[in-house]
């Protein structure tokens, strides 16, 4: 490996693991344009809070992504459906753990706790996530054919 490649890889590793290194700046409400402020206002109204998460402030650097993402999250996480709000948060936490998204794990764990998740529920959820990931890897590794009665 050439020295230049080594330094590039080390830089990528440091950037990927350093929580203080942001890819873009955060857009505060007072610095936002009208399009971004409209989304922030909807987030505040929907969530019944004045707080805007850093996630939204970061993706506000591209207003179409902010708008599209908020509309999707709003519909899926707060719209009508058969799943209660805590179950939705538990699913979000499980997917975030599997994807390794520390930001999403933290924010949705906080949201889950505000909806009634306690340490026992969180522990049970982590056991399910760990078991599902382990058995998924086994099924993939062994290339197990799907049983006829399980096929969709």
Sequence positions of predicted segments:
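Aromatic (phenylalanine/tyrosine) cluster motif
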Residues: 6-8
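Hydrophobic alpha-helical segments
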Residues: 10-12, 16-152
């Amino acid at each position: 490996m050439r020295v230049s490649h080594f330094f590039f890889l080390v830089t990528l590793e440091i950037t990927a693991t350093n929580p203080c290194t942001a890819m873009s700046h955060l857009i505060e409400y007072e610095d936002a344009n009208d399009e971004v402020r409209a989304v922030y206002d909807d987030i505040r109204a929907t969530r019944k809070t004045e707080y805007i998460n850093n996630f939204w402030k970061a993706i506000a650097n591209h207003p179409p992504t902010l708008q599209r993402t908020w509309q999707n999250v709003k519909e899926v996480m707060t719209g009508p459906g058969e799943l209660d709000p805590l179950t939705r948060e538990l699913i979000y936490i499980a997917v975030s753990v599997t994807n390794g998204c520390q930001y999403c794990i933290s924010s949705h764990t906080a949201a889950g706790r505000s909806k009634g998740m306690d340490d026992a529920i969180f522990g049970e959820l982590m056991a399910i996530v760990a078991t599902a990931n382990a058995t998924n890897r086994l099924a993939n590794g062994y290339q197990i054919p799907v049983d006829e009665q399980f096929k969709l």
